[in-house]
């Protein structure tokens, strides 16, 4: 019985460690906007409320406001609706254009979670 408890504790600790190392830490948007070169081509996580969105045929861009600033997120999935709370992770890029509109610094989404 003691061996089973030890194995369970070990698996829980191992799973937690893997989850923490696999996820990028959440970064506030003001830091990204203040120094986008520091974050360029690095994976970051952000979370906030969707304030604007543009979608075309399953792709698009949406803007997240985390209370410290706003940033556009480029997605190959459908865009979330305005007012939604989401968490997104991806890579920071500059000079992004979509449907003839320039978005400046953007997060290229690799994963999204609704809150």
Regions found by a protein language model. Give the residues of each.
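Sec-dependent bacterial lipoprotein signal peptides
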Residues: 1-23
């Amino acid at each position: 019985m003691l061996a089973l408890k030890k194995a369970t504790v070990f698996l829980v600790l191992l799973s937690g460690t893997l989850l923490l190392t696999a996820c990028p830490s959440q970064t506030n948007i003001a830091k990204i906007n203040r120094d986008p070169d520091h974050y360029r081509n690095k994976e970051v996580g952000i979370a906030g409320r969707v304030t604007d969105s543009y979608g075309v045929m399953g792709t698009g861009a949406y803007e997240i406001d985390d209370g410290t600033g706003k940033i556009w997120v480029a997605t190959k999935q459908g865009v979330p609706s305005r007012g939604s709370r989401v968490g997104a992770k991806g890579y920071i890029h500059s000079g992004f254009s979509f449907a003839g509109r320039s978005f400046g610094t953007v997060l290229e989404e690799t994963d999204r979670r609704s809150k």
